[in-house]
Amino acid sequence: MSSYFVNSFCGRYPNGPDYQLHNYGDHSSVSEQFRDSASMHSGRYGYGYNGMDLSVGRSGSGHFGSGERARSYAASASAAPAEPRYSQPATSTHSPQPDPLPCSAVAPSPGSDSHHGGKNSLSNSSGASADAGSTHISSREGVGTASGAEEDAPASSEQASAQSEPSPAPPAQPQIYPWMRKLHISHDNIGGPEGKRARTAYTRYQTLELEKEFHFNRYLTRRRRIEIAHALCLSERQIKIWFQNRRMKWKKDNKLKSMSMAAAGGAFRP
C-alpha cells in the first residue's frame, strides 16, 4: 500500500488522522483499524456505507485476507440499522446480492391507493356524465318531437285554409286587332337603332309586277295602291316607297339621256 493513497484517505474524512496506518506488516492491526472505521462511518453516510475499500484490485495473497474482509463486512452490517433491500455494498465483488422481497410482502403505498381511488372516481363521474347526457339527449328528442308535432298542426291548418279559399282568376289576355299586327315582318333590325327602317328585299315576282304597273302609270291612286298591296302581300307604305324610288331613278336616267342628247346635238352644229 502506498503512502499517497493513505494520505488522500486521511485528508478526505474528518477522523482521518486517528486512523493513520503506521504498521504495514501486521495484518491483524490493519484489519482491526479499518473495521472500526467502517463501523463508525456507516451510520454517518447511510445505506450501509462501510468507508473506502482499500483492497480493490488486490489478489488473495495481498496484505488482507479473505477472512479479515468477511469479519469487517459483518461488523459494518451489524452497525448499520438500515433494511437489507436498501443496503448497497461498495463493490459487487465482495458482497452478495440482497434477496428480493416476495410480492405478498410488498404492501401498496397510500399514493397508489389514492391513484386507484382517483381513477375509480373519474370512471364513476364519466359514467354519471354519460348517463346525464343520454337523458338530456332523450329529453331534447322528446321536446323536438313535440315541437315538430306542434309545427305540423299549423301547417296542415294553413293548407286547409288555402284549399278552402277560391283561387284568383288569371289575368285576361289583351285582345290584338288586325291593324295592330305587322303585315311584313323583317328581322333586319338587329344591331340598328330602333327608329331606323330596315331594307325590304322584294321577290322577283313582286318586282316584275311593280315594274309593269309603273310602265302603265308612274303615279298610283289610293284605290289602286290598296289593290296592289293585297295582290302582292305588301303594305301600302312599301308600295308608295317603291314607286317614289322608281320615279327618282327614272328622272335620273332621263336627265342623263337628255344631257347626252343635247351634248351630241351641239357637237354636230356647224
From Swiss-Prot:
| One example GO MF annotation | DNA-binding transcription factor activity
Annotated DNA-binding ranges come to 195-254
Give residue numbers for sequence motif Antp-type hexapeptide: 176-181
Cellular location(s): Nucleus
Q: Entry's InterPro entries? A: Antp_homeobox (IPR050296), HD (IPR001356), HD_metazoa (IPR020479), Homeobox_antennapedia (IPR017995), Homeobox_Antennapedia_CS (IPR001827), Homeobox_CS (IPR017970), Homeodomain-like_sf (IPR009057)
What is any one GO biological process for this UniProt entry? bronchiole development
Provide this UniProt record's keywords sorted from A to Z.
Answer: Developmental protein, DNA-binding, Homeobox, Nucleus, Transcription, Transcription regulation
- The ranges of region (Disordered) come to 75-175
Q: Spans of biased composition, class Low complexity?
A: 75-87, 119-134, 154-166
Name the job this protein performs. Answer: Sequence-specific transcription factor which is part of a developmental regulatory system that provides cells with specific positional identities on the anterior-posterior axis. Also binds to its own promoter. Binds specifically to the motif 5'-CYYNATTA[TG]Y-3'.
Q: How does it assemble?
A: Forms a DNA-binding heterodimer with transcription factor PBX1.
Q: What is this protein called?
A: Homeobox protein Hox-A5
What is the organism of origin for this protein?
Answer: Homo sapiens (Human)
Provide the gene name from the record: HOXA5
